[in-house]
Amino acid sequence: MKKSKHAVETKNLSISWGEVNVLDQLNFELNDGEKLAIVGPSGSGKSTILKILAGLILPTKGELRIFGEKQSYLRLDQNNPPDVRLVFQNPALLGSLTIEENVGFLLRKNKNLSKKLIHEIVCECLAEVGLFNVENKLPNELSGGMQKRVSFARALITDETLKSKTKPLLLFDEPTAGLDPIASTRIEDLINNTNDKANGSSIVVSHVLSTIERTSDKVLMLYGGKFRWAGSINEFKESNDPYVFQFRHGKLDGPMQPKDI
């Protein structure tokens, strides 16, 4: 695989639903090891970006490169897909499988791994997120918070069948949505710990200021299908840019109108 200092590169990335332009000629780069937050009001297309990066949908126009390789097919149609790991807003666990089977799903594809080794790897990943002795339980036997932790443990699993040996790209879709401040802090810690353990690059989509500020190095502001602002997290905290100021302070007055939000 071609080496690149960029985990992600997009050129004029666009997607339309019928006549509606959801994303309009987006250009950005994510360097190896960087942590990016994509922010903006609901319905601005943030989660759509993650779905494109994860290979769940294809852009209508433009170019996407992950770890230097052009992405032209859905992930399931690729012979040598990149190591992209998506943590959904909801845990997305398979209810009929045990926690060990959910977390170790990718490992079971590798016939060179024994059941004993898979068990050890899964338990190690569960321990990294503070879960012990839950591997034989079903998802509905765990609390919502514990299920969320399981989804983070799953993001620590490396698919050894991948031919590419790049560092992973971790995608977090609204990881703290609807959580109280204490629970949000715990999840933010999990995001940072998962990033450190996986030693990759990450993109977080969030509306929560503490999540944005604690889990990212730089920020992109998305509105109306276009990036309206880009800068470091420190610049985001201090910027008087009208889009950033309105988002940060929850103002009704500004370029993002309530009827659109």
Region spans (language model):
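Conserved ABC ATPase "signature" region
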Residues: K115-N133
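Conserved ABC ATPase signature
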Residues: L138-L142, M146
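Catalytic Walker B motif of ABC-type/P-loop ATPase nucleotide-binding domains
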Residues: K163-K165, L170-D173
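ABC ATPase NBD coupling module
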Residues: Q71-R85, K109, K115, E238-N240
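H-loop/switch region of ABC-family ATPase nucleotide-binding domains
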Residues: S206-H207
